[in-house]
Regions:
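Non-catalytic DNA-recognition/assembly elements of restriction-modification systems
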Residues: 1-16, 32, 130, 134-199, ...
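A short glycine-rich beta-alpha junction/loop motif
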Residues: 79-83, 116-145, 263-268, 303-330
Length: 376
C-alpha cells in the first residue's frame, strides 16, 4: 500500500531569533554539502532578526537545485535559511526513517522534476508533500533506519578521523612555520595552470567550483564529451590543488590525489601546482589552508563589486608567508604527505560506503529486501 509524504511528516514553520544562533547552529544552502554530505559551519549569519527553526530529529533539505542532494539529519536544535525545508516526523513515525525516505535518490529526482524555475530551480512545497512512498509499519521503519544508520555511522567515524588528522596537520605545520627564517610568496612556490587541452575520450567528468568543499571531492559521474558549457575548460592532474576564485569563505578547495585524466574543471577553479624545488604539493596545500592566507585572499576578493565576489590567481600569488628552503622541509613534508594520503583513503572508503547505502536504500524502502528477520 502506498501513501503520500504528507502522511508521515509536516513542514516545521516555527521561527528562532538570529541572536540565539552561531556558525555551528545556523544552516543555509551554502554550508550544506552536496551528495548527502551533511553540513559544515556557516561562513556568516543572516542579517534578519529571525529565521526558520529546526530541532533535534528534524530533516533539513536544501530547496534550491534539488539535484545537488543536500540533506542533513538534525543532531541538535538551531535555525536555517528560508531556502532550507525543515521536515518534522509525525507521531508514530521514526525520525531517522523519515530522513532516509528523503535521502532516497528517487525523492531528489521527483523534487527536481516538479521544481519551478530554470536558472535557480526550487522544489515546489505542495508537490513535495505529494511524493508517493510505500506505507511501512513502525517496527519495519526502525529496522530500515538501523541498517542504513550503521553505514552512515562508519562514514561519520571516517569524517571525525579526518577532522582530527586535519588538526594534526595544521599543528605540525604551524610548528614548522615558527622555525622559518625567511619569507616567500605563494606565487614564488606555485604555478597557475591554464591547461585547456581537450580530453580525447568520449566520456568525461565535470567538476564545478562548488563541487569540492574543504578537501572533499564528490563522486563525479561520466557524461558525454560534447555540448559542454563554456566554463568547463580546465585540465588538472594528480598532485594539483583546486581553489575556487568565488567566495573563498565557502572553502571550495581540494588536494587532488586521484587520476584526473578524464576530468574537466570549471574556469572558476584555480589549478595551483607546486614548483618542485620550492615546496612539495602537500606543503603548498597546507600553506593555502592557513587562516591568514584565506583572510587576505578573501579581503582582496570581497573588495570587488558584483553578485559573486571573484578573485584571481594574482591575488593569491602576492600573499607573503614564512618560508625556509626545501632541505628543511623534508621531514615535515613526508609527514604531511602521509596525512593527506590517509585522509584521501578514508574519503574513498566513505564514498564506497555511501554507494552501498544508496544502493540498499531504495530496495529497503520498496520492500524488495525483506527485513522481517532483522533483530534490533
Amino acid at each position: 500500500m502506498r501513501c503520500e509524504l504528507s502522511d508521515i511528516c509536516v513542514y516545521r514553520n516555527e521561527r528562532i531569533s538570529t541572536n540565539a544562533l552561531n556558525s555551528h547552529t545556523y544552516v543555509s544552502t551554502e554550508n550544506m554539502l552536496p551528495d548527502k554530505g551533511g553540513i559544515t559551519d556557516a561562513a556568516s549569519l543572516p542579517t534578519v532578526s529571525q529565521t526558520s527553526k529546526f530541532i533535534y530529529g528534524d530533516t533539513l533539505v536544501s530547496n534550491i537545485r534539488p539535484y545537488f542532494k543536500k540533506i542533513w539529519f538534525a543532531e541538535y536544535d538551531g535555525g536555517c535559511s528560508n531556502d532550507v525545508l525543515v521536515f518534522s516526523a509525525k507521531e508514530g513515525v521514526d525520525p531517522k526513517y523519515l530522513y532516509y525516505v528523503l535521502a532516497n535518490d528517487s525523492f531528489f529526482a521527483y523534487s527536481t522534476a516538479t521544481s519551478k524555475g530554470t536558472k535557480m530551480p526550487r522544489g515546489d512545497k505542495t508537490s513535495i508533500m505529494q511524493y508517493q512512498i510505500e506505507k511501512v509499519d513502525s517496527p519495519t521503519q526502525k529496522k530500515i533506519a538501523a541498517i542504513l544508520s550503521a553505514l552512515d555511522e562508519k562514514i561519520a567515524i571516517n569524517r571525525e578521523i579526518n577532522e582530527n588528522l586535519e588538526r594534526q596537520a595544521a599543528s605540525i605545520f604551524a610548528g614548522w612555520l615558527n622555525t622559518c627564517t625567511d619569507f616567500s610568496t605563494i606565487g614564488d612556490m606555485a604555478h597557475n595552470i591554464l591547461d585547456y587541452s581537450p580530453v580525447a575520450s568520449e566520456q568525461i567528468r565535470l567538476l564545478n567550483s562548488s563541487d569540492v568543499t574543504e578537501g572533499v571531492f564528490p563522486v563525479v559521474p561520466l557524461v558525454p564529451n560534447k555540448d559542454l558549457k563554456g566554463h568547463f575548460k580546465k585540465r588538472f592532474k594528480f598532485g594539483d590543488i583546486l581553489y575556487s576564485e568565488i567566495r573563498p569563505r565557502n572553502h571550495h578547495y581540494g588536494f587532488v590525489l586521484f587520476d584526473a585524466s578524464d576530468y574537466i574543471a570549471s574556469t572558476r577553479l584555480m589549478v595551483i601546482r607546486a614548483i618542485e624545488n620550492k615546496v612539495s604539493p602537500a606543503m603548498l596545500y597546507q600553506y593555502l589552508l592557513l587562516p591568514e592566507v584565506e583572510a587576505e585572499f578573501t579581503l582582496k576578493t570581497e573588495s570587488r563589486s558584483g553578485t559573486f565576489p571573484q578573485g584571481n590567481y594574482a591575488d593569491m600569488a602576492s600573499i607573503r608567508v614564512p618560508y625556509s628552503p626545501t632541505d628543511s622541509q623534508v621531514a615535515i613534508s613526508e609527514t604531511l604527505t602521509q596525512i593527506r594520503y590517509t585522509i584521501a583513503q578514508n574519503q574513498l572508503e566513505s564514498q564506497r560506503l555511501a554507494e552501498l547505502r544508496d544502493t540498499l536504500l531504495p530496495k529497503l524502502m520498496s520492500g524488495e529486501i525483506d527485513v522481517s528477520a532483522v533483530q534490533l
